[in-house]
């Protein structure tokens, strides 16, 4: 039976082995009263950090050890009212500029004003670019939804055209080919012109 217990390895847990920490506690416990040290040992736990990492984190999961060395980016959200947001940005920048001007010397004043003007111009440029992108997106979205309506109208017009051709074929089955082609050309011209004007409307 001793052979089976010696070949059987104990399961490695998160906590430190009792034998490694228990032996040091036992020797000190024998010196200064074993009951006090046993109580402290029962109340406190010592964690084996390497066992925790090995048990709960695979080797390929080192994403929590990576560090970002990039500086934070300044982001300004665009509000619904484009003109109001431009005014708000100008107001905030001017307030920040006034506080900065009071804190600096007269020699630094000219450098700071240049930097502030360039940063204000840059922020305005970014804001205008974002507003332009938003406007273009909304225009494309409107055109996309109008495209569905245009397709429905085109289907209705095609259906009406087919119905009118069927009615004409039933009424005059013996008509000449020249009359049909002239009639079809006159009908097609207004229909295609109508589709073109409808697709251009926003």
Curated annotation (Swiss-Prot):
Example GO biological process: regulation of signal transduction
Polar residues: compositionally biased ranges: 71-80
Family: Belongs to the protein phosphatase inhibitor 2 family.
Protein's recorded name: Protein phosphatase inhibitor 2 family member C
Region Required for binding PPP1CC, residue ranges: 12-17, 43-55
Compositional bias of kind Basic and acidic residues: 84-112
Domain of life: Eukaryota
Disordered as annotated region, ranges: 1-51, 71-118, 162-202
Lineage, broadest ranks: Eukaryota, Metazoa, Chordata, Craniata, Vertebrata
InterPro entries: PPI-2
Keyword hit for Metal-binding: no
Ranges of compositional bias, category Low complexity: 19-35
Region (Required for binding PPP1CC catalytic center, displacing metal ions and inhibition of PPP1CC catalytic activity) location: 144-147
GO terms assigned for molecular function: protein phosphatase inhibitor activity
Membrane among keywords: no
Function, in words: Functions as a protein phosphatase inhibitor. It inhibits activity of the catalytic subunit of PP1 and weakly inhibits the activity of myosin-associated phosphates.
Expression sites by tissue: Detected in sperm (at protein level).
Keywords: Protein phosphatase inhibitor
């Amino acid at each position: 039976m001793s052979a089976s217990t010696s070949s059987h390895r104990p399961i490695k847990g998160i906590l430190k082995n009792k034998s490694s920490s228990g032996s040091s506690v036992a020797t000190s416990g024998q010196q200064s009263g074993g009951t006090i040290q046993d109580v402290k040992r029962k109340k406190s736990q010592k964690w084996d950090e390497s066992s925790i990492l090995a048990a709960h984190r695979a080797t390929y999961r080192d994403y929590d050890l990576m560090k970002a060395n990039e500086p934070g980016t300044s982001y300004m959200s665009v509000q619904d009212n484009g003109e109001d947001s431009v005014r708000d940005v100008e107001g905030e920048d001017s307030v920040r500029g006034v506080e900065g001007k009071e804190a600096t010397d007269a020699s630094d004043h000219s450098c700071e004003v240049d930097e502030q003007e360039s940063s204000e111009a840059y922020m305005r440029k970014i804001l205008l670019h974002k507003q332009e992108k938003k406007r273009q997106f909304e225009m494309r979205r409107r055109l996309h939804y109008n495209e569905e309506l245009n397709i429905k109208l085109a289907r209705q017009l095609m259906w009406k055209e087919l119905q009118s051709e069927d009615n004409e074929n039933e009424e005059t089955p013996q008509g000449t080919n020249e009359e049909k082609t002239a009639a079809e050309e006159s009908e097609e011209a207004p229909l295609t012109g109508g589709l073109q004007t409808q697709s251009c409307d926003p």
